């Protein structure tokens, strides 16, 4: 799984209005890129950081560029495009990378479910032995000393998803919280109790109720270190629920 076209490198000037980022290209040109991330992006927007943009030739688009990657510190990459994780997770599942979710015949996206009117990211069905698996995907980019934390801001929506997953377990199905680790410096994932204590509490309750929690890290760079290379998930990362 790769970017469809080579990315364009630049330097971050600023992010503003949540969805916009000004970037200076190598020739000195300044462009405004779409920032497809509604979170705080804590730790992922250092001043003058190296960033990589995808480019669209669609004349109907208001902004030609989309912010994809950032170098959070020398040699460490993060993918800030929150549109990517669902496709990354699905590709890994269908390729057999995620052993705990292997053997399902069908994968559907954005299926309506639950009493709180949610949409599940991925619904796996058609397994010979296991019940259907409801998979909620979350992007992890907040890193502190090798630890990855989720969420990076208080998330009532994320809390709702945990309640919905617990309900699916009660209904007799599998429910899975899938952390896509889009940061090459993260070695372990844990709940960000210091940011959203309620989310951490609910996550632990969900695990006790039977919700499965897994995490896989993306490559983000090719074998030659080219940051416009690989998006595929390549390695499972441990999850710790200790406070």
From Swiss-Prot:
Gene Ontology molecular-function annotations: DNA binding
Pfam family, one: SfsA
Superkingdom, natural source: Bacteria
Alphabetized NCBIfam families for the sequence: sfsA
Family under the similarity heading: Belongs to the SfsA family.
Stated name of the protein: Sugar fermentation stimulation protein homolog
């Amino acid at each position: 799984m790769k970017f469809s076209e080579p990315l364009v490198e630049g330097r971050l000037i600023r992010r503003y209005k949540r969805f916009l980022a000004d970037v200076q290209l190598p020739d000195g040109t300044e462009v405004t890129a779409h920032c497809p991330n509604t979170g705080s992006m804590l730790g992922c927007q250092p001043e003058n950081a190296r960033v990589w943009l995808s480019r669209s030739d669609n004349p109907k688009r208001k902004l030609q560029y989309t912010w994809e990657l950032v170098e959070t510190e020398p040699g460490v990459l993060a993918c800030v495009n929150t549109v990517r994780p669902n496709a990354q997770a699905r590709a890994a599942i269908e390729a057999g990378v995620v052993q705990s979710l292997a053997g399902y015949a069908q994968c559907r996206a954005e299926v309506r479910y639950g009493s709180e009117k949610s949409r599940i990211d991925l619904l796996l069905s058609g397994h010979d032995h296991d019940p259907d698996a409801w998979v909620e995907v979350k992007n992890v980019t907040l890193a502190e000393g090798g630890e990855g934390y989720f969420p990076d801001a208080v998330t009532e929506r994320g809390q709702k998803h945990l309640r919905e997953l617990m309900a699916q377990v009660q209904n007799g199905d599998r429910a899975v919280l899938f952390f896509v680790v889009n940061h090459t410096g993260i070695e372990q994932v844990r709940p960000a109790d210091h940011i959203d204590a309620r989310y951490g509490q609910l996550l632990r309750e969900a695990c006790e109720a039977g919700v499965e929690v897994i995490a896989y890290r993306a490559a983000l760079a090719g074998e030659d270190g080219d940051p416009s290379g690989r998006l595929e998930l390549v390695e499972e990362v441990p999850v710790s629920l200790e406070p």
